[in-house]
Amino acid sequence: MEYIYASLLLHSAKKEISEDALKNVLTAAGISVDEVRLKAVVAALKEVNIDEVLKNAAAMPVAVAAQPQATQAQPAAEEKKEEKKEEEKKGPSEEEIASGLASLFG
C-alpha cells in the first residue's frame, strides 16, 4: 500500500512516477524499499491513467455498513458449525476399534 500512496503523492505533486522518485519518497517515510516491488509498481502505473482511476473511484458507490444484529447472529452460526465438526471428528467408538483389533488376533 505504501508504494501506491507514494505514487499518488508524486502524481498529486505533478512529478514523474519513476523508480528513483518513488524510492526517495519511501525512504523519506522510513520504509525499506523492495526493489522488485518498486519496479513492478512503476511498470504497472506506466499503463494507467491515474486521473481517470481517481475520477472513477470517486464515482463508485460506497457499501453500506452491516447491521449490528447481523453480527450477533454470526457467533451462533459459528458455534453450530463447530458442534457439527466435533460430531464428524468423533469417528468410530472404542468398542468398534476393539472389535476390529480382536478380529486381527482370531
Swiss-Prot record:
Pfam families: Ribosomal_60s. GO terms for molecular function: structural constituent of ribosome. Gene3D superfamilies: 1.10.10.1410. Residues 66-106 are annotated as: Disordered. GO terms for biological process: translational elongation. Residues 66-76 have a biased composition (Low complexity). InterPro entries: P1/P2_N_sf (IPR038716), Ribosomal_P1/P2 (IPR027534), Ribosomal_P1_arc (IPR022295). Keywords: Ribonucleoprotein, Ribosomal protein. Residues 77-93 have a biased composition (Basic and acidic residues). GO terms for cellular component: ribonucleoprotein complex; ribosome. Belongs to the eukaryotic ribosomal protein P1/P2 family. Forms part of the ribosomal stalk, playing a central role in the interaction of the ribosome with GTP-bound translation factors. Part of the 50S ribosomal subunit. Homodimer, it forms part of the ribosomal stalk which helps the ribosome interact with GTP-bound translation factors. Forms a heptameric uL10/P0(P1)2(P1)2(P1)2 complex, where uL10/P0 forms an elongated spine to which the P1 dimers bind in a sequential fashion. This is Large ribosomal subunit protein P1.
